[in-house]
Amino acid sequence: MIDFSEDLLPLSGLQHFAFCRRQWALIHPEQQWQENLRTVEGGLLHRRAHDEAARERRSDTLILRGLQVVSHQLGLSGQCDVVEFHAAPKGVPLQGEEGLWQPYPVEYKRGKPKSHQADELQLCAQAMCLEEMLCCSIPEGALFYGEPRRRTVVLFTPELRETVRRDSDEMHQLYRRGHTPKAKPSKSCSACSLKELCLPQLVRRESVQTYLRRAMEESP
């Protein structure tokens, strides 16, 4: 696998990429962004997760919030909402702590579990970062959704891991090329925070910046 040590992309972009490659390109390479109710609610949920004590002990579980992670193999870096470390005989040592600990990443999301795998891919990428950093194996983690307010366990299967690797590689290829995929309108577009910038009804191959620049040049 290629080592992306000098070319790290935001891990959070993996979720955008899995949901819509054009959305990812608008947010990251083109740095376009718009807030809507969904993104505001999602941001509040993440802030609540990070606002609590960054380090907490509950019996035989150590809870870390806002933990920075990186994978040079995937070329991704980011922040985990919560990583639980459970005391385990086959875990890993942690600085300042006695015994061995098994990492268990938990990601907070608004709404309900989705029909696509975007959330699962982001969580799996976090686990793969932790595995690379701690030299350990993490078989599963959990997604906590805001509406049902309960956890959904995610198994990090070989298939899910391979999708993370493939999408990460494709993200780097598109980023290096500066390419923004053309719009492919779908029912998901109505809730997208970038629908006004993306202009999916035009189904253009050009980037948003190119379109806006051309529109300004053509205006009287």
Predicted features, each with a name:
Residues 1-105, 205, 214-220:
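Metal-dependent nuclease catalytic cores that hydrolyze phosphodiester bonds in DNA/RNA
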Residues 4-7, 170-186:
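Short, intrinsically disordered, charge-biased short linear motifs at domain edges
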Residues 11, 22-23, 161, 168, ...:
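Alpha-helix initiation and N-capping motif
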Residues 17, 28, 163, 167, ...:
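Residues that form generic nucleotide/phosphate-binding pockets
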Residues 20, 179-220:
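Cysteine-cluster motifs in flexible loop/terminal segments that predominantly coordinate metals
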Residues 55-58, 145-151, 180-187:
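Noncatalytic linker/hinge segments flanking ATPase motor cores
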Residues 77-78, 84-177, 190-196:
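Nucleic-acid nuclease catalytic cores
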